Amino acid sequence: MGTYTADAVSLLVYLVDTLPQRADQIFTEAEAGETVIQAPSTALVEALYSVARDKNVRGVTLTGTPEAARQALVGNGPVSVAPVADEELIRYVRIVDAFNIHDALIVASHQAQGTDAIIATDGVIQETGFETVWK
């Protein structure tokens, strides 16, 4: 069973159903229980914050409540909350200078949890050699 770390953007794009093919396939597998998608709580909070502010994602305006989005992602959805414990923090402080605050936590979680890849659009993560999935 594959395991992946998702960033906030991928969660938002999932909510508006506009994921690119490979990322959509992974989320579909997770919905079927065949793959695990994890996201640090901060990535989930960023996505829920965007829902609360009716942010536009890929030309689609987010509607609904943060609670409905939480249910769609975690409650009844394909995403689980990745722990942020000492191991993640140890990895975070080692890489924080190479990334912004959000990307550093995504990469640290990916490393600590040993996931197969990161579901993200971020070019900075891709350019540093971490396995990413988007297209």
Region roles according to the model:
Residues 24, 42-44, 48-80, 86-90:
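Active-site-proximal, substrate-binding regions of enzyme catalytic domains
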Residues 1-39, 54-64, 113:
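Short, well-structured N-terminal submotif of metal-dependent ribonuclease cores
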Residues 33-34, 76-77, 128:
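Structured helix-beta-strand junction loops
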Residues 78-116, 121:
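Active-site neighborhoods of divalent-metal-dependent phosphate/nucleic-acid chemistry enzymes
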Residues 6-7, 13, 39-40, 99-101, ...:
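Histidine- and aromatic-rich ligand-binding microenvironments
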Residues 24-28, 70-71, 106-107, 122:
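Short amphipathic alpha-helical segments and helix-helix/interface helices
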Residues 10, 43, 88, 105-106, ...:
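Alpha-helix capping/helix-boundary segments
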Residues 1-3, 107-135:
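Acidic, PIN/NYN-like endoribonuclease modules and their adjacent C-terminal/linker elements
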